[in-house]
């Protein structure tokens, strides 16, 4: 379907709506307009698509020439929090609203069978990451509590399901009723209240330690309490910060781990080389446990992870923002207030001017770039204007270094302890696309058995 182009002598033009974008699927719209999307991005022209969160306010896809200005803009001009509230209807469904304090805390403080067995590994990853993340964010007491771990794993899915139901069933002018009448919204409030109850003993322990001479706890509860004064009567604010951090970490890290594993299973020759690297570093390590230095030395694994992220990104768009007030870019492009904007991940990840031979999965691509250009750049958690899978600017993922180490640890333990392969005749399943998201399909088995010495 052809695209009508609005011509204007200045960038203050009416941004063109992509024809055929009445569907909620970004993938479907891009397929219908595959040539023009590429031309718009290449020529630096913004365009609009239907917004799944609010069809009355189309989503603006910005060309990459605006990325530098966007990432350096003040929160009052371009806000990820404002985008999240709009996109997931957080204020209508009794969901926790993310705070800048929680963001600062993560950025500043954290950074046996012999036979083959069929296994769907996603929930294994999710539960492992939930416990690991909870140990760091909530401390040893709550990370060992099965109820807390279950809430951390299921809360995101409950929130997303409720958001989708409210978006589909309630017009914008009726959404103010949702917190009181929608079962999902009422359930989210109950979960938040239960989290506050579970958190209370940990809060009291840390509060007592802050008064006395006890050594401070090294977890996000302590870090949050250092940044903000919480009172017993409003512990839900503290638990909301915990839930917000879990929403931002557990399932995205689990999906990235699953996607990397799928790509490893498709390339057993890479798996063998990475296993050799892991064994070598473990043999040379002076510690019985993994150290950060050991993990940093896993350069082949790190390069494979980043190439997997480039080739199969978790998400079709990135650097998602919304502007609380009208904004004018330096070249004169004017964006009305409350406009949701983003940048396309695939187009940058597959740009031959940035990544030569982009349609080829090159496991050592980023290892060579580190060796030839800068060993401190191009690692998995690295962000730049050429690498935006973790976002850009002030709201690039603050926990990406922690997530990188979680993924490495899980893959190392799997590769050291188990042999893995696809069932006969199977390879990586097609990626799941919905709205602007893309995720590896978790509903497929892999074959696994204990590694024989």
UniProtKB/Swiss-Prot annotation:
It comes from the Eukaryota. Its cofactor is heme. InterPro entries: Cyt_P450, Cyt_P450_CS, Cyt_P450_E_grp-IV, Cyt_P450_sf. It is a single-pass membrane protein. Belongs to the cytochrome P450 family. The keyword Transmembrane helix applies. The lineage of its organism: Eukaryota, Fungi, Dikarya, Ascomycota, Pezizomycotina. Coiled coil: none annotated. This is Cytochrome P450 monooxygenase CYP2. One of its GO terms (biological process) is secondary metabolic process. Keywords: Glycoprotein, Heme, Iron, Membrane, Metal-binding, Monooxygenase, Oxidoreductase, Transmembrane, Transmembrane helix. It comes from Pyricularia oryzae (strain 70-15 / ATCC MYA-4617 / FGSC 8958) (Rice blast fungus). Pathway: Secondary metabolite biosynthesis. Its EC number is 1.-.-.-. It is an enzyme of class 1 (oxidoreductase). Glycans are attached at residue 85.
């Amino acid at each position: 379907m052809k695209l009508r182009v609005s011509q204007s002598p200045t960038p203050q033009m009416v941004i063109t709506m992509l024809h055929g974008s009445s569907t909620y699927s970004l993938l479907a719209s891009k397929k219908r307009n595959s040539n023009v999307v590429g031309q718009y991005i290449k020529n630096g022209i913004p365009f609009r698509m239907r917004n799944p969160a609010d069809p009355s306010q189309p989503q603006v896809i910005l060309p990459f020439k605006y990325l530098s200005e966007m990432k350096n803009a003040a929160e009052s001009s371009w806000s990820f929090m404002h985008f999240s509230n709009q996109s997931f209807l957080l204020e209508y469904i009794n969901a926790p609203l993310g705070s800048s304090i929680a963001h600062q805390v993560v950025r500043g403080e954290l950074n046996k069978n012999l036979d083959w067995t069929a296994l769907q590994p996603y929930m294994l990853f999710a539960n492992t990451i939930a416990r690991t993340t909870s140990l760091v964010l909530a401390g040893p007491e709550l990370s060992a509590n099965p109820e807390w771990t279950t809430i951390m794993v299921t809360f995101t899915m409950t929130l997303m399901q409720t958001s989708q139901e409210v978006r589909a069933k309630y017009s914008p002018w009726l959404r103010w009723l949702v917190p009181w009448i929608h079962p999902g919204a009422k359930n989210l409030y109950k979960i938040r209240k239960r989290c506050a109850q579970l958190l209370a003993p940990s809060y009291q322990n840390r509060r007592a330690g802050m008064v006395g001479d006890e050594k401070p706890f090294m977890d996000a509860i302590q870090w949050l309490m250092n940044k903000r004064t919480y009172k017993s009567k409003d512990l839900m604010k503290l638990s909301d910060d915990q839930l917000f951090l879990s929403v931002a970490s557990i399932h995205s890290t689990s999906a990235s781990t699953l996607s990397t594993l799928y790509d490893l299973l498709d390339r057993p020759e890479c798996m063998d080389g990475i296993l050799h690297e892991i064994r070598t570093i473990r043999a040379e390590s002076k510690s019985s446990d993994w150290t950060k230095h050991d993990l940093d030395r896993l350069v082949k694994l790190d390069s494979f992870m980043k190439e997997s992220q480039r080739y199969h990104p978790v998400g079709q768009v990135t650097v998602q923002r919304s502007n609380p007030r009208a904004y004018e870019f330096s070249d004169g492009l004017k964006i009305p207030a409350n406009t949701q904007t983003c940048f396309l991940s695939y187009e940058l990840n597959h740009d031959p001017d940035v990544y030569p031979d982009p349609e080829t999965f090159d496991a050592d691509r980023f290892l060579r770039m580190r060796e030839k250009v800068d060993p401190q750049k191009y690692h998995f958690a690295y962000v730049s204007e050429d690498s935006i899978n973790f976002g850009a600017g002030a709201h690039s993922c603050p926990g990406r270094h922690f997530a990188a180490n979680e993924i490495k640890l899980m893959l190392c333990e799997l590769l050291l302890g188990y042999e893995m392969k696809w069932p006969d005749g199977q390879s990586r399943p097609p990626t799941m696309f919905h709205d602007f998201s893309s995720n590896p399909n978790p509903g497929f088995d892999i074959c696994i058995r204990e590694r024989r010495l």
